[in-house]
Amino acid sequence: MTMYIAFILSTIFVIGFVGFSSKPSPIYGGLGLIVSGGVGCGIVLNFGGSFLGLMVFLIYLGGMLVVFGYTTAMATEMYPEVWVSNKTVFGAFVSGLMMEFCMVYYALKEEEVEIIFKFNGLGDWVIYDTGDSGFFSEEAMGIAALYSYGTWLVIVTGWSLLIGVVVIMEITRGN
């Protein structure tokens, strides 16, 4: 059941990026990125990374949502273009969705999928096994290493997010 949930979340993840890559309007492109980011955090949570999924959700969807808000405010249109307003964009979006659904149907129906590389059922989607982690989880050890050995990485990341928000605010403020 867990592998089916991961498979469905991966499909929604790809559909969100198909919606983003068809670029109808900055508002809908930001919506596609937000949906894909939330589903990506759900995938991380599904594989047991509760703290990492929460942090990515808070940082990506909290911090980058500010940037999306300012960029869409800068590029507002009276009549924003949607996916169905342009026949070429709509055709590319529908064909991408149909290819994704055909791939999902083929992978769920067949026991073995071999297109470019070979899958033996949904069990090959498992990335790692946490049975041998002992008393400490791998996630807790990674977080401890990030804040003890990677202090400068955390500081540089925080400053770059702050500078990004300040630059976007200065651009949208006007001349």
From Swiss-Prot:
Keyword Membrane: yes
GO MF terms, alphabetically ordered: NADH dehydrogenase (ubiquinone) activity
Main location: mitochondrion
EC number: 7.1.1.2
InterPro entries for this protein: ComplexI_Subunit6, NADH_UbQ/plastoQ_OxRdtase_su6, Nuo/plastoQ_OxRdtase_6_NuoJ
Domain of life of the organism encoding this protein: Eukaryota
Gene Ontology BP term (one): mitochondrial electron transport, NADH to ubiquinone
Cleavable signal peptide: none
Location(s) in or outside the cell: Mitochondrion inner membrane
Transmembrane regions listed in the UniProt entry: 1-21, 25-45, 47-67, 88-108, 149-169
4Fe-4S as UniProt keyword: no
Keywords tagged on the record: Electron transport, Membrane, Mitochondrion, Mitochondrion inner membrane, NAD, Respiratory chain, Translocase, Transmembrane, Transmembrane helix, Transport, Ubiquinone
Enzyme class name: translocase
Any one annotated GO CC term: mitochondrial inner membrane
Assembly, per entry: Core subunit of respiratory chain NADH dehydrogenase (Complex I) which is composed of 45 different subunits.
Family from the record: Belongs to the complex I subunit 6 family.
Described function: Core subunit of the mitochondrial membrane respiratory chain NADH dehydrogenase (Complex I) which catalyzes electron transfer from NADH through the respiratory chain, using ubiquinone as an electron acceptor. Essential for the catalytic activity and assembly of complex I.
Protein's UniProt name: NADH-ubiquinone oxidoreductase chain 6
Native organism: Sus scrofa
